[in-house]
């Protein structure tokens, strides 16, 4: 709408008075992406995409480059902070019914897929033991695709095994994808401002709005400052909290780590993958764990938008949060009982939330009608 665009130019965009702190994570994500692009740019100046030099180039950045340790840690901790904010942002969208703004939700889910791909390519670049073996395990899943799988895997690797061409193309992809993320983020924000943000009540907030500036700008700045402070405290005192000890050893194709696992933010999807004993089934479940978010706007049957007044859905939502955490925890454990059974049960519960969403909505409508 032209009227809204003029208001945006002067920072007068009207926003609902009752939006809570959960609405601040969008601006925090923009800050994260800006930080990641800046630190990544400086790191790329010193990085060498060669299997014999990649690991040494990271060591060189940390030891010899002025403030290189800070750049490297900011980039690594920044990725974790990015995913913490993303998962909270998605959870808020699910809880408050923001997914009913279909275009914004679908562009956001596409952004999440692009972000996960970028993070995966980035995890391979240091060429440590876990980087190499995580890349081998995850890319090998393509071989599960009937007929085309082996050809696609060879094409992705640039050979018959993960080697120098693989690292070179992963670096190229890791460099180019963030620009796609920035472009899609712009589209995501434009689509959001076509309709405007929802609010915790899930009602139309046209009746009661305030200008975005100064109220929400200061609130955003406070949350961004808090996030940066947490990041700086983490890189100063516990910089390796999210790192795997195996990744401090250079990649060796002849030595397999005892327990192969990706970064913590992929563990829920990896846990779902591991819970299914069939390779193709596991690969499909892995893809569906993210793709199922695309179905949410089309399966909403409740008359109420937000979960604020939906106790049954609240129970299901917090069960989803608990299952997400339990799957993440089981993915860090060996593939043996009782962990396999726990991950199978929690994976089923994860998908059950999305499948039972329309049924619960329909039941709630029935209960509301009988009470009226």
UniProtKB/Swiss-Prot annotation:
Task: Name its cellular compartments.
Answer: Mitochondrion inner membrane
Note from the entry: Heme 1 (or BL or b562) is low-potential and absorbs at about 562 nm, and heme 2 (or BH or b566) is high-potential and absorbs at about 566 nm.
Q: Among the entry's GO cellular component annotations, what is one? A: mitochondrial inner membrane
Family, per entry:
Belongs to the cytochrome b family.
Q: Which keywords fit this entry according to its UniProt record? A: Electron transport, Heme, Iron, Membrane, Metal-binding, Mitochondrion, Mitochondrion inner membrane, Respiratory chain, Transmembrane, Transmembrane helix, Transport, Ubiquinone
This one is known as Cytochrome b
What is known about its subunit structure? The cytochrome bc1 complex contains 3 respiratory subunits (MT-CYB, CYC1 and UQCRFS1), 2 core proteins (UQCRC1 and UQCRC2) and probably 6 low-molecular weight proteins.
Q: Where does a ubiquinone bind?
A: 193
InterPro entries on file: Cyt_b/b6_C, Cyt_b/b6_C_sf, Cyt_b/b6_N, Cytb/b6-like_sf, Cytochrome_b, Cytochrome_b_C_euk/bac, Cytochrome_b_N_euk/bac, Di-haem_cyt_TM
**Cofactor(s) of this protein:** heme b
Purpose? Component of the ubiquinol-cytochrome c reductase complex (complex III or cytochrome b-c1 complex) that is part of the mitochondrial respiratory chain. The b-c1 complex mediates electron transfer from ubiquinol to cytochrome c. Contributes to the generation of a proton gradient across the mitochondrial membrane that is then used for ATP synthesis.
**Which residues make up the binding site for heme b b562?**
75, 174
Q: How is the cofactor bound?
A: Binds 2 heme b groups non-covalently.
């Amino acid at each position: 709408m032209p009227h809204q665009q003029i208001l945006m130019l002067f920072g007068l965009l009207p926003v609902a008075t009752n939006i809570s702190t959960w609405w601040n994570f969008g601006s925090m994500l923009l800050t994260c992406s800006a930080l990641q692009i800046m630190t990544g740019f400086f790191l790329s100046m010193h990085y060498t995409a060669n299997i014999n030099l990649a690991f040494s180039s990271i060591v060189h950045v940390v030891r010899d480059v002025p403030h290189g340790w800070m750049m490297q840690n900011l980039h690594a901790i920044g990725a974790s902070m990015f995913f913490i904010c993303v998962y909270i942002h998605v959870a808020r969208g699910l809880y408050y019914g923001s997914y009913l703004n279909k275009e914004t939700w679908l562009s956001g889910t596409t952004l999440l897929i692009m972000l996960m791909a970028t993070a995966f390519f980035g995890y391979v670049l240091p060429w440590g033991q876990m980087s190499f073996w995580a890349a081998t395990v995850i890319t090998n899943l393509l071989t599960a695709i009937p007929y085309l799988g082996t050809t696609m895997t060879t094409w992705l690797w640039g050979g018959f095994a993960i080697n120098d061409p693989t690292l070179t193309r992963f670096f190229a992809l890791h460099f180019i994808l963030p620009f796609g993320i920035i472009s899609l983020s712009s589209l995501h924000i434009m689509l959001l401002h076509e309709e405007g943000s929802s609010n915790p009540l899930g009602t139309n907030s046209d009746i009661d709005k305030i200008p975005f500036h100064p109220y929400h700008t200061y609130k955003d700045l406070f949350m961004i400052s808090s996030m940066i402070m947490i990041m700086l405290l983490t890189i100063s005192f516990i910089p390796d909290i999210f790192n795997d000890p195996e990744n401090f050893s250079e990649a060796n194709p002849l030595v397999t780590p005892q327990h192969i696992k990706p970064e913590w933010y992929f563990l829920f999807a990896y846990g779902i993958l591991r819970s299914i004993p069939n390779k193709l089934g596991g690969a499909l479940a892995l893809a569906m764990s993210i793709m199922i978010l695309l179905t949410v706007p089309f399966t909403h049957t409740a008359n109420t938008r937000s979960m604020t007044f939906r106790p049954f859905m609240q129970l299901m939502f917090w069960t989803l949060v608990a299952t997400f955490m339990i799957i993440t925890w089981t993915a860090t454990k060996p593939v043996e009982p009782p962990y396999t059974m726990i991950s199978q049960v929690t994976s089923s519960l994860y998908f059950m939330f999305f499948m039972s969403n329309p049924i619960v909505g329909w039941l709630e409508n029935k209960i509301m009608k009988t009470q009226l």
